[in-house]
Swiss-Prot record:
Keywords tagged on the record: Chloroplast, Plastid, Ribonucleoprotein, Ribosomal protein, RNA-binding, rRNA-binding
Gene: rps4
GO CC term (a single one): small ribosomal subunit
Name recorded for this polypeptide: Small ribosomal subunit protein uS4c
Pfam family, one: S4
Gene3D superfamilies membership: Ribosomal Protein S4 Delta 41, Chain A, domain 1, RNA-binding S4 domain
Domain of life: Eukaryota
Main location: plastid
Protein's cellular compartments: Plastid, Chloroplast
Function: One of the primary rRNA binding proteins, it binds directly to 16S rRNA where it nucleates assembly of the body of the 30S subunit.
GO molecular function: rRNA binding; structural constituent of ribosome
Length: 201
């Protein structure tokens, strides 16, 4: 299954705010009316919508998300918490959380077009898993720095999560630690996502 490329507003009307996909937000009043008209949701639909919310926010294919769920299931600790940590530590998401890109799709383009270095080396894989003490910088070229400066200027002001540090004048971000789940920017019940996949197997 491919990544979602159709109009984004339809998704946020149904699933709620998806900051990684778009900065647009649904009109709350209309959405509540639509939801009440649609009647009570089944447990399956509730789990499905949480899964879709996670997938669209991080810009993953169904196969990619399933792979992350399986990796999280084999790790120590809560599967849902580990799943969120894996997704939050992706390079494209780290760039988004730093404000060096306005959305995760924009961050993915920066990485794909080789504008980003990790610890001094170009990384062109958006799913690259960042680690504590990683240093993320823009390539030392005018085009790369101009792109990132534009994103930094246009990104809505928000509190930087504690696991990251931004040095905007140097176009540099630092990963201080693995993210704590309370700093995840998406409102999500990750246990419902894990339940969704456990019932599919």
């Amino acid at each position: 299954m491919s990544r979602y490329r159709r109009p984004r507003f339809k998704k946020i009307r149904r699933l709620g705010a998806l900051p990684g996909l778009t900065s647009k937000r649904p009109k709350t009043g209309n959405d509540l009316k639509n939801q009440s008209r649609s009647g009570k949701k089944s447990q399956y639909r509730i789990r499905l919508e949480e899964k879709q919310k996670l997938r669209f926010h991080y810009g993953l294919t169904e196969r990619q998300l399933l792979k992350y769920v399986r990796i999280a299931g084999k790790a120590k600790g809560s599967t849902g918490q580990v799943l969120l940590q894996l997704l939050e530590m992706r390079l494209d998401n780290i760039l988004f959380r730093l404000g060096m890109a306005s959305t995760i799709p924009q961050a993915r383009q920066l990485v794909n077009h080789r504008h980003i270095l990790v610890n001094g080396s170009i990384v062109d894989i958006p799913s690259y898993r960042c680690k504590p003490r990683d240093i993320i910088t823009a390539k030392d070229e005018k085009k790369s720095r101009t792109l990132i400066q534009n994103y930094l200027d246009s990104s809505p002001p928000q509190e930087l999560p504690k696991h990251l540090t931004l040095q905007p004048l140097q176009y540099k971000g630092l990963v201080n630690q693995i993210i704590d789940s309370k700093w995840v920017s998406l409102k999500i019940n990750e246990l419902l996502v894990v339940e969704y996949y456990s019932r599919q197997t």
